[in-house]
């Protein structure tokens, strides 16, 4: 099972990625983790990436694709792998295709933006314990206070509505075009690509976690 997980920030990709990886015995591939590991190990690509990062630049797609190809050679990828958060752009997707990275499925978890804004901006956190609440779906007994200690709850900066809207805007402009890219490739076939087109699946990310997980496995095993 080799797949890419698509969806907006707050769509629940991280939660479902965990269940998919457990079900199929595959690793979750994170470009951030790969970069850190390569830099730490001092590999040729890691050294190249470190120079760019130390200069305050963005690591090129060529370096990232090289890291991806190295990572997929490791033994834990023999049964497949899951990409979450990569590719983010059409050029990255094209580079993966040109590099011959095989993908069986592209799965989109679809959640309307207004639902994501409500979901994320309603989160509240008790900093000391990490306990989380939601003003609508899991409210504390007393508004703004942790159930066990009575301490004040906070809204993380990442969960503030303005921040959520900015992240969704970046997704809309940069990453959502991948939906059309992969669904079009799946529908229209291979062209001159080095790898077979993936199957494209889209599920609703609205509902409880168990229901969404059921939809995920139904889509991947259909």
From Swiss-Prot:
So where does ATP get bound? 10-15, 123, 132-133, 207
Q: What is its main location?
A: cytoplasm
Return the SUPFAM superfamilies for the record. P-loop containing nucleoside triphosphate hydrolases
LID: annotated segments: 122-159
Q: Which GO terms describe its cellular component?
A: cytoplasm
Keywords (alphabetical) are: ATP-binding, Cytoplasm, Kinase, Nucleotide biosynthesis, Nucleotide-binding, Transferase
Q: What does the entry list as the binding residues for AMP?
A: 31, 36, 57-59, 85-88, 92, 156, 167
Q: Where is this region: NMP?
A: 30-59
Q: Which GO terms describe its biological process?
A: AMP salvage
| Classification via CDD domains | ADK (cd01428)
Q: Where is this region: Disordered?
A: 135-162
- Subcellular location per the Swiss-Prot or TrEMBL entry: Cytoplasm
GO MF: adenylate kinase activity; ATP binding
EC numbers for this chain: 2.7.4.3
**Per the similarity annotation, which family is this?**
Belongs to the adenylate kinase family.
Tell me how this protein assembles.
Monomer.
The protein here is known as Adenylate kinase
Organism per entry: Ralstonia nicotianae (strain ATCC BAA-1114 / GMI1000)
């Amino acid at each position: 099972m080799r797949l890419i997980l698509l969806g907006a920030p707050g769509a629940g990709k991280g939660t479902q990625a965990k269940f998919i990886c457990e079900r199929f015995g595959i690793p979750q591939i994170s470009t951030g983790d790969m970069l850190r590991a390569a830099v730490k190990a001092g590999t040729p690509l890691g050294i190249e990436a470190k120079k760019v990062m130390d200069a305050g630049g963005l690591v090129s797609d060529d370096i990232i694709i090289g890291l991806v190809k190295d990572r997929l050679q490791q033994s834990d990828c023999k049964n497949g792998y899951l990409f979450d958060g990569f590719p983010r752009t059409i050029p990255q997707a094209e580079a993966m295709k040109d590099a011959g990275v095989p993908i069986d499925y592209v799965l989109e978890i679809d959640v309307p933006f207004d639902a994501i804004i409500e979901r994320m901006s309603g989160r509240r956190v008790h900093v000391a314990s990490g306990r989380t609440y939601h003003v609508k779906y899991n409210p504390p007994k007393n508004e703004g206070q942790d159930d066990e200690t009575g301490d004040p709850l906070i809204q993380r900066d990442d969960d503030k509505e303005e921040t959520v809207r900015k992240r969704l805007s970046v997704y809309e402009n940069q990453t959502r075009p991948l939906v059309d890219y992969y669904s079009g490739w799946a529908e229209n076939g291979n062209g001159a690509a080095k790898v077979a087109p993936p199957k494209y699946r889209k599920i609703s990310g609205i509902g409880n976690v168990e229901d969404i997980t059921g939809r995920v496995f139904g889509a991947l095993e259909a």
